[in-house]
Regions:
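Acidic, glycine/proline-rich Ca2+-coordinating loop motifs
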Residues: 1-288
């Protein structure tokens, strides 16, 4: 198995072409030295034990984002496995299986605006209506950063100091100032972009500067990604769309990276299992 230019992320197996053997999905996680640009994932067809690149599904998986988790599941109830992807700084993607050819139906299901730093994904019929629901894990609601559709987190990225490497600036609208402001201090920004020390001679000069003012004269407009949700979320399958329901408050106290769905207590209902906690090495994401 080859042809992957990114670091390898999630793996998933299913007989998606209906020939009786298990085929392989290889998720693209991160492009080395190019985070957070979207990676490309791949499907490999199982041909009598030899895996060959599925060229028919190349386009639908090109630059689908930084895939952190994946699961095959019959989301549309037509009898074949569809592909569900959790992406970082992106949506939970659903790729519908149409006789071995996949179609990205994320937008038509109303999921394209539900962007997060999604870590894990699993499926199961959580409300007993016969339809496969999705559970996606995120960073929870107990950390230093919060996000909402009206006040999203934004990640600006580009070669701002023109040294051939990507620079990153995390930003959010300051509720008091009503302006889009960086979420890192001047010292951290100046370490990554030394030219700022020439532009801002004092902390006072920098303190009230918006993202537009800081990055406005760095050349080409920066690329930007947005996160509108950080909650661990149940996506209820309503047939033609999904309804987002946050998991209970106790589940939101820490990030979660793996999620499993099964009847753990034997009562006939599907339950949700989360693995949680995060030990950070870089501020502001302390241990939680």
């Amino acid at each position: 198995v080859g042809g992957i230019s990114s670091t390898v992320g999630a793996l998933a197996l299913a007989d998606y072409d209906g020939d009786g053997d298990l085929d392989l999905f290889v998720g693209g996680r991160i492009l080395p030295a190019l985070y957070p640009r979207p990676a490309t994932s791949r499907l490999f067809v199982n041909d009598a034990g030899a895996f060959t690149l599925d060229s028919e599904n190349l386009d639908v998986l090109a630059e689908r984002g930084m895939v952190s988790a994946a699961v095959f599941s019959d989301v549309d109830g037509d009898g074949d496995p569809d592909l569900v992807l959790a992406t970082e700084w992106g949506p939970v993607r659903v790729l519908r299986n149409d006789r071995g050819r996949f179609v990205d139906v994320t937008a038509s299901l109303g999921l394209d605006g539900l962007t997060g730093r999604w870590n894990g994904v699993a499926t199961g019929d959580l409300n007993g209506d016969g339809l496969m629901d999705i559970v996606a894990t995120n960073w929870g609601q107990n950390g230093p950063l919060l996000a909402s559709p009206t006040r999203p987190l934004r990640l600006y990225h580009g070669d701002f100091d023109r040294n051939g490497r990507l620079d990153l600036v995390l930003a959010q609208v300051d509720e008091q100032l009503g302006r889009l402001m960086p979420l890192v201090d001047f010292r951290q920004l100046a370490q990554a972009m030394p030219f700022l020390r020439l532009r801002y001679r004092t902390a006072e000069n920098f303190a009230g500067s918006s993202i537009a003012e800081i990055l406005g004269s760095t050349g080409a407009p920066p690329a930007v990604l947005e996160v509108t949700h950080l909650e661990h979320t149940l996506l209820l399958n309503r047939g033609s769309s999904f309804e987002a329901v946050p998991l209970p408050t106790t589940a939101q106290l820490a990030p979660s990276f793996f999620v499993g769905v099964a009847d753990f207590d034997g009562d006939g209902n599907e339950d949700v299992f989360l693995t949680q906690n995060f030990l950070a090495t870089v501020s502001p994401a302390d241990q939680y």
